[in-house]
Amino acid sequence: MRVLHVCSELFPLLKTGGLADVAGALPGAQIAAGMDVRVILPAFPDLKKGIANLQVVRELDTFAGHVTLLFGHFNGVGIYLIDVPELYERAGSPYHDPALYAYADNYLRFALLGWMGCEMACGLDHYWRPDIVHAHDWHAGLTCAYLAARNRPAKSVFTVHNLAYQGLFAAGHMANLHLPSDFFQVYGLEFYGQISYLKAGLFYADHITTVSPTYAHEITLPAYGYGMEGLLKTREEEGRLSGILNGVDETIWNPTHDPLLTNHYSREALANKAENKRHLQTAMGLKVDDKAPVFAIVSRLTSQKGLDIALSAIPDLLEQGGQLVVLGAGDADLQEGFLAAAAEYHGQVGVQIGYHEAFSHRIIGGADVIMVPSRFEPCGLTQLYGLKYGTLPLVRRTGGLADTVSDCSLENLADGLASGFVFNDCSVGSLSRAIRRVFVLWSRPTLWRYVQRQAMAMDFGWQVSAQAYGALYQRLHTH
């Protein structure tokens, strides 16, 4: 089966969020599972620079200008790049200028991405044509609309990584998109008088997936649906909406051979984790103390991530003898709040503003608990890294967090299912009660190590996701 992924980012060459991790790992896992998989992206500078020996496949004139379609390989995966320098040759973020203003021509830049995804299914590359076109997030949403306009030359899957980003553009651009004008309606890609690239994907795809089963249901509810819940509820009832968990790239995230860790360790030999903890305490200016559990936050500092309630719970956490490490950047008031806590509780709280991939590995390899108290979380990767590294996740029961972490309740401990700490309400009180449960388990070291080993034994490798997508593709292809 031939599968084409249509997306805008690719780890490690270009990353602004979790979408890049998926695009960087899922295709390789699918190839290992026996599928013939390629990826198509805009030729952003970091991608062009990072992919060697690019060859010209086709040159063509389009509604968005002259396109050179390039092809090369990266990490064993075939990559197509859509080269239009006047659209994509811009330094920095692929979506906005240095002043953080979205590019005015984003409607055209990402319409072309969708159109090229569709053209690939129509035979643009004479030597390779996909059976399934798999589009990701709003940037690729128009792919599904173009396929529908061309009588569906391939089956389409649209994956929502985060429904909050909708790709909204003025209705006047419809004339420039090379789509039938009657697609601009409620039963189409119109959304409150604008064009929504996200809705185009949701409405026209043969099947919609999200990155966890719980999030797939949550987005059919008004609280999580961002106005799309009616359409998504219909797709759920039609059996055209499902959730498939993201995976962990074990070539990058594995404590037995992670090159970014000072000391390696495994499920069977956990002693070196304590060494990593001492290094972390020293690096963050904390008191070196084996008996103090180190809680960690590695995240964008936003209220979506529930970090306002985490900030309010700090005194409670420290009173019971814990320490806190924070790595992230985001809302100015949250940054200031965490920095103020570090100044007030010197030796107990360490904060680094910014994001450093290498340091995130050292934090997760050295901490005892990783906190992910999100208001909503489509999948979440941080808690999966925590499980893999025996750094027990403390999470709110939402989205992918609900699907991947089992609370250390007495029955879960007895059944060998416990892997972390889960709380329900997005409130300081609910989080504080979960923190209290952390300390109760921490006071029983044998039980703590038992839960660590349970967590580290869980399999969230990409091969599991690859098989689930493979089964979905097969079902679509044969119907």
Swiss-Prot record:
Keywords noted in UniProt: Glycogen biosynthesis, Glycosyltransferase, Transferase
Catalytic activity field: [(1->4)-alpha-D-glucosyl](n) + ADP-alpha-D-glucose = [(1->4)-alpha-D-glucosyl](n+1) + ADP + H(+)
Gene Ontology terms, MF aspect: alpha-1,4-glucan glucosyltransferase (ADP-glucose donor) activity; alpha-1,4-glucan glucosyltransferase (UDP-glucose donor) activity
Family matches, as InterPro entries: Glyco_trans_1 (IPR001296), GS/SS (IPR011835), Starch_synth_cat_dom (IPR013534)
Pathway membership: Glycan biosynthesis; glycogen biosynthesis
Enzymatic class: transferase
EC number(s) reported in the record: 2.4.1.21
CDD domains reported for this sequence: GT5_Glycogen_synthase_DULL1-like
Keyword Glycosyltransferase annotated: yes
GO cellular component annotations of the record: cytosol
Function: Synthesizes alpha-1,4-glucan chains using ADP-glucose.
Family stated for the protein in its record: Belongs to the glycosyltransferase 1 family. Bacterial/plant glycogen synthase subfamily.
Protein's name according to its UniProt entry: Glycogen synthase
Taxonomic lineage from the root: Bacteria, Pseudomonadati, Pseudomonadota, Gammaproteobacteria, Enterobacterales
Gene symbol of the encoding locus: glgA
